[in-house]
Amino acid sequence: MKYLLIALGGGTGSLARYLLGTAITSRVGARFPIGTMVVNVSGCFAIGLAMTLLTERLQPHPYWRLALVVGFLGGYTTFSSFEWETYAAVREGGFWIGLANVLGSVTLGYAAVWFGALLARR
């Protein structure tokens, strides 16, 4: 059952990302990736809201976290997971771990995109 919930959530999140991102880009233009930014930032808000509610206030069945966070937000954006993990590290006193996560993820992520594009062009 948990795999089905993750898959359904992931498919729904991916579709939501595509629909929202393309709707914004079609209205604003593609010069700056505002559609992706809106998706990523809204995903960050959603994971902050969802994880806090699910772990501190509501404490529902663990399947809710799988469907909403791992599934939907995982399909919607992985950026939200990255930001939550950074937030959690800083909140628990690991400022330098959080900073290293931000700098490392952005730097390595950019380098990976650059390298992948380089390989694809060969």
UniProtKB/Swiss-Prot annotation:
GO molecular function, one term: metal ion binding
Recorded GO CC terms: plasma membrane
Keyword terms: Cell inner membrane, Cell membrane, Ion channel, Ion transport, Membrane, Metal-binding, Sodium, Transmembrane, Transmembrane helix, Transport
Positions of Na(+) binding: G74, T77
Regulation of catalytic or functional activity: Na(+) is not transported, but it plays an essential structural role and its presence is essential for fluoride channel function.
InterPro entries linked to this entry: FluC
Top-level lineage group: Bacteria
Compartment(s): Cell inner membrane
Membrane topology, from the record: Multi-pass membrane protein
Broad class of the protein's primary localization: membrane
Catalytic activities: fluoride(in) = fluoride(out)
Segments crossing the lipid bilayer: 4-24, 34-54, 66-86, 95-115
One Pfam family per UniProt: CRCB
GO biological process: cellular detoxification of fluoride
Family: Belongs to the fluoride channel Fluc/FEX (TC 1.A.43) family.
Reported function: Fluoride-specific ion channel. Important for reducing fluoride concentration in the cell, thus reducing its toxicity.
PANTHER family assigned: FLUORIDE EXPORT PROTEIN 1-RELATED
Name of the molecule in the record: Fluoride-specific ion channel FluC
Organism for this UniProt entry: Solibacter usitatus (strain Ellin6076)
